[in-house]
Amino acid sequence: MTISIQGISVSRGIAIGQVHCIKRDQIDTPEYLIRKTQIDSEILRLDNAITNARKELRAIRDHIPSSTSINISEFINTHLLMLEDNALTEEPKRIIKDRLCNAEWALKLQRDALVNR
């Protein structure tokens, strides 16, 4: 099987060969249950995190030198679009309410559900 991958080059030339995954890092996501009385504050925490992520991505995008490849800006724009997707912004709120789990865990559960679709 042949797979062709396109992207931004970091060095000159073409690389051909087998891919070896040395280490698969996973983000250490805190997973804990919350009380029903904490649902609103946990959803607010998620909303604030999404808002801050948008601000940070926009700030990064706005400071990219004009000489940089347009692909970099488009990469950031893609992430901004993901932060507008209800599947990643609203569904975790339902998970927080239904499962009484913290925001990070709810987002991880939703991410896994989307990946396994």
Predicted regions and their residues:
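Non-catalytic, soluble scaffold/interaction modules
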Residues: 1-117
